[in-house]
Amino acid sequence: MYNVGIIGLGQIAYSIDNDPARKITWSHINAYKKSKNTQVSSICDIDETQVKKISQECDIYSGYTDYREMLKNEDLDIVSICTPINTHVQIIKDCIKHNVKAIFCEKTISYSLDDSSEIVELCKKNNVVLAVNHVRRWDDFNQKIKNIITQDNYGDIYT
């Protein structure tokens, strides 16, 4: 069983699935709950009210308002980063420092190509799996379009 920590408790972390129009799971917490191999063991947000609310709703017993404390105190295998883009680089570096094995980061890693490249290299160097959540990449429709394009039936395609 992999222990998961979620940093940032906005819509994509949890509440986006409360929309009855959504037919599939989009949130990090609910996606991890569906897996037999993962357990969300701790959550973190700067809003303590949000931490308490989601802790109660999801039966998560470990909640923090400082992600550094969570990384220091919890033995996490996977961390989902659901915070604003300008925070991603430092959080990823701190996750690496605390031996997190896999990081699932909301798009994009950074506003800076240099910072993004540095993060990719740090993850490679430290054997950390890094995935960036570009949801549409795995969407069935987009996979079909990709297959059509890669079969080269249409010649050069320009955007």
Predicted feature descriptions by range:
Residues 38, 101, 128-129:
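Short, well-ordered coil/turn segments that N-cap beta-strands
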Residues 1-58:
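N-terminal Rossmann-like dinucleotide-binding module
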Residues 109-159:
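A contiguous active-site-proximal alpha/beta segment in oxidoreductase catalytic domains
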Residues 31-34, 53, 69, 94, ...:
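Well-formed, non-transmembrane alpha-helical positions, independent of function
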Residues 28, 88, 134:
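Histidine-centered active-site/metal-ligand motif
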Residues 58-122:
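Beta-loop-alpha module in the N-terminal Rossmann-like domain of NAD(P)-dependent dehydrogenases
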